[in-house]
Curated annotation (Swiss-Prot):
Name used for this protein in its record: D-arabinono-1,4-lactone oxidase
NCBIfam families: FAD_lactone_ox
Modified residues (Pros-8alpha-FAD histidine): 60
Organism, as annotated: Kluyveromyces lactis (strain ATCC 8585 / CBS 2359 / DSM 70799 / NBRC 1267 / NRRL Y-1140 / WM37) (Yeast)
Listed cofactors: FAD
Pathway stated in the Swiss-Prot or TrEMBL entry: Cofactor biosynthesis; D-erythroascorbate biosynthesis; dehydro-D-arabinono-1,4-lactone from D-arabinose: step 2/2
Family: Belongs to the oxygen-dependent FAD-linked oxidoreductase family.
Length: 525
């Protein structure tokens, strides 16, 4: 297919804006291919024309990693189910789909067949390709990265080749592609291992901050799914714990900020505290917390709800936001949270900076067995994953020294802790983040942490590579980069990723926004 024919199927007046509204771009051409063959032709045209391609889905990464002035591709039209194979003896099925299919669409299709995705992150708007490309995870002592549910991938690499990948066929490329940052190839098809549909019976408790820390050793392994929302100014935590059940659904929990009125009031109060009177922030938190959750500690007697797996695992992310998420060993959690608590309190007293809430605290188990276990004794409500693969992505940001243990032996020593620092952008207006995020990153880094690839980590000019500006020339929210630390953290795995990237994309078709890759050590300047 000639370039003229390829370009004839593209738009030249398209503006891409990410969900948070922080970044936007106007690509030279915007493509929405209708087939894998069209993807191949677009890649070959890019090689011929010396262009780069970025693939985007829902745009939920709040960073600038997808910004480009060259070619942009969206796979929403690649949304077909290719094959559905049941393994009734071990209670799972392998579903093969085109990778532009959104997760919420896949969940609807699976529900019609009596199946569900095993574990999800906070949202379901991502595509099948996008959800694994930056290391999405849920919150569970038994489940790890969403990519561990993937049996195989089909990619179009930077040579225009259609390549099938799994644990046996090109396992090294598979490890790179299951967390690729969009730099290995375009994922066009995937097979995901799913399980019989289930509901989640959850208990939601209001507890004191100290209660969380005092029960740290046992809380995190007390349910299959668990997460906390920390409100530092009120010194309260909302503890959510859930397990699979076949019990019928109950009425959803009431949500003050889930109403149009509550949501508007909350966002308006944030706007006032950001733009007019920052010292109001702790009082806004207290008011909102009491409206949403009440005033009484309910540890051991929280409210119980039965939801679909999707409703239970997803959450309302509220407003446009900056997000800085880091992961570290769970055993370092109490020290980290006490340090952050002290810093947040001191900063408020000195009117240095104020944080928005909640600060989300989650865990995952990204340790992997040497081989896929026997699942013949599972039931529909058995805890834990049915692995699609047991290969760790080279760029997995979770701690590397943690060792696998069977579900019955899992302790905090197998688990990674994720802490999510969020600053809202009320009504689409920016809020200051640099002081808080820098302190947060220093604290997490000292605890053996690393940032989530897709989030708004800042880094520092001392760690960056490529075009480094004077500190005064950066916008408050602008990423400086972390090249030197990322090289140190990932070591041989990063070198292997680079080698595979060069092999699969020798023409640098997928090196759009090269500055982002350089300042974070993905490639050399």
């Amino acid at each position: 297919m000639s370039f003229d024919l390829v370009a004839g199927n593209a738009r030249s007046n398209f503006v891409f804006k990410n969900w948070a509204g922080i970044y936007s771009c106007r690509p030279q051409l915007y493509f929405q291919p209708n087939s894998i063959d069209e993807v191949v032709q677009i890649v070959k045209a890019a090689i011929e024309q010396g262009k780069t391609i970025v693939t985007v889905g829902s745009g939920h990464s709040p960073s600038d990693m997808c910004v480009t002035d060259q070619w942009l591709m969206n796979l929403d039209n690649l949304n077909s189910v290719v094959e559905f194979k049941e393994n009734k003896e071990e209670l799972y099925a392998d579903v093969t789909v085109e990778a532009g299919l959104r997760i919420y669409q896949l969940s609807e299709i699976l529900a019609e067949k009596g199946y569900a995705i095993q574990n999800l992150g906070s949202i379901s708007e991502q595509s099948v390709a996008g959800i694994i490309s930056t290391g999405t995870h849920g919150s569970s002592p038994y489940h790890g990265l969403v990519s561990s549910q993937y049996v195989n991938l089909t990619i179009v690499n930077g040579k225009g080749e259609v390549v099938f990948l799994d644990s046996e066929n090109s396992p090294e490329v598979f490890r790179a592609a299951t967390l690729s940052l969009g730099k290995i190839g375009i994922i066009v098809k995937a097979t995901i291992r799913v399980i019989p549909e289930f509901n989640i019976k959850s208990t939601q408790e209001v507890i004191h901050f100290e209660t969380l820390l005092n029960n740290w050793e046992t809380i995190w392994t007390s349910s299959e799914f668990i997460r906390c929302w920390w409100y530092p100014y009120t010194r309260k935590v909302v503890l959510w714990r859930g397990s699979k059940t076949e019990e019928p659904l109950t009425a959803p929990r009431k949500s003050w900020w889930g109403s149009t009125f509550g949501r508007f009031i909350y966002e308006s109060l944030i706007w006032i505290s950001v733009k007019i009177y920052p010292a109001l922030t702790p009082y806004v938190e207290s008011f909102v917390f009491h409206q949403q959750y009440g005033r009484v500690e309910t540890y051991g007697s929280g409210d119980v709800s039965v939801q679909t797996s999707i409703a239970g695992l997803n959450m309302d992310c509220l407003f446009s936001q900056f997000v800085d998420e880091w992961g570290c060993p769970l055993n370092n959690g109490p020290e980290v949270l006490r340090s952050l608590d002290y810093s947040i309190t001191q900063a408020a007293q000195n009117k240095e900076f104020f944080v928005h809430v909640p600060v989300e605290v989650r865990c995952s188990n990204t340790t992997l067995p040497a081989e896929i276990p026997d699942y013949s004794n599972r039931t529909k409500t058995s805890a834990g994953p049915v692995f699609g693969n047991t290969l760790r992505p080279y760029l997995d940001a979770t701690p590397r020294h943690l060792r696998y243990a069977p579900l019955s032996d899992v302790t905090n020593s197998q688990l990674s802790l994720y802490i999510n620092a969020t600053i809202y952008r009320p009504f689409g207006s920016n809020s200051p983040i640099h002081k808080w995020f820098t302190l947060f990153e220093d604290t997490m880094g000292a605890a053996g942490g690393k940032p989530h690839w897709a989030k708004n980590f800042l880094g520092a000019t001392s760690m960056a590579a490529g075009k480094v500006k004077d500190e005064k020339d950066y916008d408050d929210y602008e990423m400086r980069g972390m090249a030197t630390k990322i090289k140190e953290w990932y070591g041989e795995d990063l070198l292997k990723f680079r080698e595979i990237r060069s092999q699969q994309d020798p023409n640098n078709v997928f090196m759009a926004n090269k500055e982002w890759a350089i300042r974070n050590g993905i490639i050399e300047p």
